[in-house]
Amino acid sequence: RSCSGRRLEYRRVRTEDPAPELCLSSNGRRGPGANVGTVTDTPDLYTTAGKIADLRRRYDEAVVSAEAKAKEKQHAKGKMTARERIELLVDPGSFVEFDEYVRHRTTAFGMDKNRPYGDSVVTGVGTINGRTVAVYSQDFTTFGGSLGEVSGDKIIKIMEFALRSGVPIIGILDSGGARIQEGVLALSKYGEIFRANTRSSGVIPQISIIMGPAAGGAVYGPALTDFVIMVDKTSQMFVTGPDVIKTVTGEDVGMEELGGAYTHNTRSGVAHYLAEDEDDAIDYARTLLGFLPDNNMAELPTYSSDFEFETTDADRTLNTLIPDSANQPYDIHTVIERVVDGAEFLEVQPLFAPNIVIGFGRVEGRSVGIIANQPSQMAGTLNIEAGEKASRFVRFCDAFSIPIVTLVDVPGYLPGTDQEWTGVIRRGAKLIYAYAEATVPLVTVILRKAYGGAYIVMGSKQLGADVNLAWPTAEIAVMGGQGAVNILYRGEIKRAEEAGEDVAAVRTRLANEYTYNVTSPFLAAERGEIDGIIEPANTRVSIAKALRALRGKRAELPPKKHGNIPL
């Protein structure tokens, strides 16, 4: 009741409305952990009790009631709400929300009649396995998750908080793009977000989880982060949509084909993991974070490990891995799983440029980055896509002081006009630049082929690798035996043809002689080009010992503002 004794009707009010003479009954507590009651008494907003009651009412409107409505909408689509996604991502009960009471200030197009608390994004901090992370999650049930002035400010604020605090930031995107009612104000926030992404790059890990659409300017934020996770049949990313493309170019393309999760995981290389569903996407992000430090100055996470320095039966299986025929493939994952602790390897971009494998593992409980040629895909050759995939990974590992282990079996660069015309020289040079610039511990093991320029590019000693080892099956040369025969033994081949000899047999004999006399790893070892030749079974232990010796590595680049990588 009011002071005059009139019964007042409960209603929600905007902040600009006069303070209502409302209060909550003793059982009408609102807020975290409180029971939602009914309004029966008159509050006195000039008293502490009345102000607390008003806070509870506003919290109910901003969080409790808003979340109930969001669940109804999102669950009908088989999706989680923005807050549910955060709760699944962080440790139970650890999330602390920021800015849940902010509201947009737009009055155009009737926007002043719809000013929900929190706007279109939920931000805050929580923990993942006890480690603090900053999080923002766009709310598609509020203005389609569109970015406006206030929601943009919320995202920028949490990004700046993460940078100041030195903690990773994870963005969960589900947005229709810029809020057209706010015009340039919305666009300007994209620019500020991009700048914040760039300033944070190499300082704190940045992970983007795409849970819905991301169009126009919204796509460049994730592209500036370190890892992009997309959900199959749910996520889309594109600069211009199918309708615009149809109008301008006449091309008829669907949303999934244009910018779906599968497209960006297999063709464009924008995404780093194709998740089956939202749970899988969040689980991958949590697992990924377990390999990364909080920031570029922090120590790597270390886990207990029962590392065995004696050769095991599993180690000995590597002695029979390499086929006798140099042209017969094998799966490089077998080697990786023997090298890392517990055979646990988190692959990054497994569907893009599969001829090179990158990802994270642990050796003696410490994180390492793995880069390896894949002989079972395109014979392990390097091409533009593989070079760019690996170079970006090298630079990430170097930025966060994650040691790099390189496993080499590369016959060379993929030949062809398509590669040459699309810039294999310039784009292939990125991997050279990345390795040569890296100051983290670099350990390289040559398993089989290491031919030509591709050998130099793949973490060679000449580019600065600290420890270079080789298996006895390694072949290190300008080119393989078959290619060398065509150049070095052209006369002998011609004479064999004229004499009616078995040319194929002659070629094989000459190729074998070249392989033995020129490509043998012992020749490279004699000249100090590699540091040792090891039995395959000793690979795991040899890598562990090398990394242990390099823990105190100190290396500095010449003073400069920044280099000019061949972008």
Indicate where each model-derived feature is located.
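Long, contiguous binding/interaction regions
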Residues: P32-A34
